[in-house]
Structures are given as C-alpha cells and as structure tokens.
Amino acid sequence: MELNMLKSKIHRVTVTQAELSYVGSITIDKALMKAANILEYEKVQIVDIDNGARFETYVIPGEENSKVICLNGAAARCVQVGDKVIIMCYCSMDEQEAKDYKPIVVFANEDNTINKISNYERN
C-alpha cells in the first residue's frame, strides 16, 4: 500500500510578492528550496497563517538568497504581501518506509532566511 506523507515543509515564511498577472505557481528562494528538498515544478500545498487559506500550486525557483516568496497567478488572490505561510510538500512511500520516515522542516526567520533545519520526531 502506498501512503501520501509529508516530505518537507518550510515553516512561517513571509510573502514578499503577489503577482496576479503571472502564469501560476509560487516562486521560492532557491536556498529554501534546497534546504527543504523541494524541486522545481514540484506540487506544494500552502497554508496562509493569517487568513486560513489553503491551496495548491507548483514551485519555481527564485534567485538564491533573495528571500523571495512570491505567489503568482490565481494564487496571488489567496494572500497579502506580509502574510506568514507554511509551504508543504508531500511524497508517496510504502507503509514500511513511512513508519520510520521523518520529514524535513525548515524554520524561517522573519526575513525568510533559514533559522533552523530539523526533522519531525515522533511523539
């Protein structure tokens, strides 16, 4: 049996831009993408901590160390610049692998730089 599991997440980054006229996606600083093991064009789920919106899109890389978090296209309507968001990425794995898997969690500072990288621990 294949299970959909949290692969990684970028926790509490700040939206720096919202570009309604762009063709879809979220632009994420490449340094954050690397830290969270998120690939270009990978599907992500985004939760806006400020307004409760939850939606999906795909990732395009921003310039490394640019601190950019930009929602593009229709997703730009779901956020405001300055909102805090959580970006989550999922993967499929078999049940045996899932039992021992620990997702990557990238904690961000207020300026979207990396504060800490860790793994979820089981309770």
From Swiss-Prot:
Domain of life of the organism encoding this protein: Bacteria
GO BP field: alanine biosynthetic process; pantothenate biosynthetic process
Known catalytic reactions: L-aspartate + H(+) = beta-alanine + CO2
Cofactor needs: pyruvate
Cofactor binding note: Binds 1 pyruvoyl group covalently per subunit.
Catalytic residues, chain numbering: S25 (schiff-base intermediate with substrate), Y58 (proton donor)
InterPro entries, alphabetized: Asp_de-COase-like_dom_sf, Asp_decarbox
CC per GO annotation: cytosol
EC number from the UniProt entry: 4.1.1.11
Pathway it works in: Cofactor biosynthesis; (R)-pantothenate biosynthesis; beta-alanine from L-aspartate: step 1/1
A GO MF term: aspartate 1-decarboxylase activity
Residues that bear Pyruvic acid (Ser): S25
Binding-site residues for substrate, renumbered to this chain: T57, G73, A74, A75
Keywords carried by this UniProt record: Autocatalytic cleavage, Cytoplasm, Decarboxylase, Lyase, Pantothenate biosynthesis, Pyruvate, Schiff base, Zymogen
Post-translational modification (record): Is synthesized initially as an inactive proenzyme, which is activated by self-cleavage at a specific serine bond to produce a beta-subunit with a hydroxyl group at its C-terminus and an alpha-subunit with a pyruvoyl group at its N-terminus.
Compartment annotation: Cytoplasm
Family: Belongs to the PanD family.
Quaternary structure and partners: Heterooctamer of four alpha and four beta subunits.
Role noted for this protein: Catalyzes the pyruvoyl-dependent decarboxylation of aspartate to produce beta-alanine.
Official protein name in the record: Aspartate 1-decarboxylase
Organism for this UniProt entry: Clostridium novyi (strain NT)
Gene transcribed to yield this protein: panD
